[in-house]
From Swiss-Prot:
Keywords: Cytoplasm, Metal-binding, Nucleus, Zinc, Zinc-finger. It is found in: Cytoplasm; Nucleus. InterPro entries: CRA_dom, CTLH/CRA, CTLH_C, Fyv10_fam, LisH, ZF_RING_GID. GO terms for cellular component: cytoplasm; GID complex; nucleus. One of its GO terms (molecular function) is ubiquitin protein ligase activity. This is Protein FYV10. Residues 126-158 form the LisH domain. PANTHER family: E3 UBIQUITIN-PROTEIN TRANSFERASE MAEA, MACROPHAGE ERYTHROBLAST ATTACHER-RELATED.
Amino acid sequence: MAVELTSIKLNPENHLLLDQPLLRVPHELARRNFKSVQRIVEREKDYVLPALKETANASLSGSKNPTETIEALDAMITRMQGLKRKMEVLHEEEKKIATQSQKRIQYIQDLYKIPSLADVKYEQWSRTRLNRLLADHMLRSGYLESAKQLAEDKGIADLVDLSVFAQCQRIAHSLRRGETKEALQWCGENKVALKKIQNRLEFELRLQQYIEVLRVGDKAEARQHAKKFLTPHSETQSHDIQRAAGLLAYPPDTRAEPYMSMYSLERWKHLSDLFIRTHHDLLSLSSRPLLQIALSAGLSALKTPSCHSAIASSRASPLSLSTSICPICSTELNELARHVPYAHHTKSSVENDPVVLPNRRVYGMDRLSDMSKKAGVPEGKVKDPITGEIFDVSEVKKVYIS
């Protein structure tokens, strides 16, 4: 008995599998913001408290005159005013993250209030998620302004990580241009997290700086750079450090491997891709766009072996009776669905009069005869609705399902 749509109960847990980064990203951003506050306060405290104590003692002992004491106090006041400005900026960032988290939690809670798939609220919620997935795909593809416009038009700016992907794209593009400054600054801000996961991004960036110094022929500077930035990684990156040392003996136009590859400008693309992977790992972002993951799940539910057969239904002849409305067979989705698994069917629907054609395709005889008649095939002949081949009825053999 068919189950009506109104009786299909919604399972929020299944729907939220795609939405895990929704709360993880603001949580990670809040943690980073707190660490920044902690680091700045500790640095200023380590400077101001000893300086204040020293100034007070000097003033009491008379080793400093009043003018020098006032100058020292003014310097400390200026420093504290700078601290206040930094704290205000970080506080605004914290408020922004808190607002984002609140909106995202509300968005998730709304799903738990929807009783079934037939509820009109589910359609509204799904439309919002689709817009989110589209914006996510645009951001990952580099269409930042389009994603921003979509988010603003649909009122989902707090549900989309615009600033996160904007920063990621900016740094990735700087690496493709041959610049390491922004990427190294990012590594410095995330030094503890990178060390925890034993990521080699910073080492690769320093190695690239070493290569660029050698490219201009400054071997003395290259040795100093290696001693300062590469040697500290000797325990974990000894093999690459040895290869880097070998570069001293080879010019940039060498054809010898692995040095030719190390000098190659393609390394900048490798660094850009490595940065994006590292950035996404730290923020618990998936390596693939969420839209692609969602599509893959849906495509798998629809995919059958005939969708990627040698004879594609979408390319069949005009006389073919095959349909071209299958999403898997469409030009847009066919390649994306190529590597997803087939649908898992626990029950099969088999015609009660199956026959096999000479090309080994199986159909129901009544349905095959009816379609052949509609296609104008001469009497005593049948036509394969997929390939368009025509066979004599005597060539058709009955199939017995055991």
